């Protein structure tokens, strides 16, 4: 009887440890929180902002160090993605821990090194900002 009781306690402790360690860490000190919307279309003629249609982005979002994006440019996009922090956006929502620094926010398919999509984080700061990323499919 005591052996069975001991096994129940061990099992219960194991379950609690597994549950505690498998939970996602949502609180952090330095990082980014926001919503990312994405749209694409012809830019001939240019589509005014008010006429553009955006959707909440679902997919991988990369936080590329600005200095690396500036030096490697679009030809180095694959290497930049491999070295960058990335998270999966769901219904546009992004919540990510980042080190202090300056980052350009890019989606999986498009290199968009634009000041409009750049964030600068100081240690201990969480930037909360929403972005609308528009990609021209023709010029």
Where would I find each of the regions flagged by the language model?
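Bacterial signal peptide processing site
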Residues: 24-26
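Short beta-strand segments within Ig-like beta-sandwich modules, predominantly Fibronectin type-III
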Residues: 85-89
């Amino acid at each position: 009887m005591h052996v069975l009781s001991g096994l129940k306690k061990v099992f219960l402790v194991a379950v609690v440890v597994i549950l505690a360690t498998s939970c996602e860490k949502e609180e952090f000190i330095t990082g980014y929180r926001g919503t990312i919307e994405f749209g694409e279309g012809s830019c001939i003629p240019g589509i005014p902002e008010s006429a553009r249609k955006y959707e909440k982005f679902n997919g991988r979002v990369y936080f590329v160090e600005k200095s690396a994006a500036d030096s490697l440019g679009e030809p180095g996009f694959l290497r930049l993605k491999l070295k960058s922090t990335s998270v999966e956006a769901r219904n546009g929502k992004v919540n990510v821990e980042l080190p202090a620094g300056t980052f350009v926010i890019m989606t999986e398919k498009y290199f968009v090194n634009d000041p409009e999509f750049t964030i600068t984080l100081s240690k201990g700061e969480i930037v909360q900002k929403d972005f609308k990323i528009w990609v021209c499919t023709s010029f």
